[in-house]
Amino acid sequence: MNGILISLEGPDGAGKTTVLKEILPEIQKMKREIVPTREPGGVRVAEEIRQIILDPKNTDIDSKTELMLFAAARRLHMQEKMLPALQAGKVVIVDRFIDSSVAYQGYGRDLGVEVVDWLNYFATDGLKPDLTLYFDVDTDVALERIMKNRADEVNRLDLERAEMHRKVREGYLEIVVKEPERFVKIDASQPLEKVVADTLSVLKKRFVSEF
């Protein structure tokens, strides 16, 4: 497998999804084909699981069920879309991957990092990104952005208490420290143009031979 896997991570409201849309025209200049995708989702059945997970009406989904739904969607997505692209030598850039489960379910839901790490490994056969861009923003700022920018489409996780969102951010910050060779932290509190510029700078430095 000689493709490149890049993941984008961060708390809800960090703006990584918007950044991905903004950088796509530039990174599509890379020598390899770019495959942008997202989790949960990316393929038909995984997108259906996404709807179940994020539907605000599904308040009866407990933490363990939530974790396993994410893992099921991840397995489908990896098998059907990510692996074939990587095996074909393409660049897969995914909006959320294994670290989201560690941050949200391991830390945010208090299920424990070891449990989530094991399930991630089981679901992905140990697949890890070559590079993970972590978009960091203060929790209060992130929640304010959510209510301002997507008040009409908040999902079940957006509606969680601020304390859970704080635990998620703290979890991400611990994960970043544990794997400094894989993670690059980007200050997502900056204006969008600066965040986009910083993101492109990291990608061009890390994969200089690919541009």
Swiss-Prot record:
Q: Into which EC class is this enzyme placed? A: transferase
* Reactions listed under catalytic activity: dTMP + ATP = dTDP + ADP
What UniProt keywords apply to this chain's record, in alphabetical order? ATP-binding, Kinase, Nucleotide biosynthesis, Nucleotide-binding, Transferase
Tell me which species this is from.
Lactococcus lactis subsp. lactis (strain IL1403)
| EC numbers on record | 2.7.4.9
Looking up PROSITE patterns in the UniProt record yields: THYMIDYLATE_KINASE
- Record: residues binding ATP: G10, P11, D12, G13, A14, G15, K16, T17
| Domain of life the protein comes from | Bacteria
Coiled-coil positions? none
Give the Pfam families listed for this entry.
Thymidylate_kin
A GO cellular component entry from the record: cytosol
What's any GO biological process attached to this entry? dTTP biosynthetic process
Family recorded in the similarity comment? Belongs to the thymidylate kinase family.
Q: Which GO terms describe its molecular function?
A: ATP binding; dTMP kinase activity
Tell me what this protein is called. Thymidylate kinase
Q: Which InterPro entries match?
A: P-loop_NTPase (IPR027417), Thymidylate_kin-like_dom (IPR039430), Thymidylate_kin_CS (IPR018095), Thymidylate_kinase (IPR018094)
**Job description of the protein:** Phosphorylation of dTMP to form dTDP in both de novo and salvage pathways of dTTP synthesis.
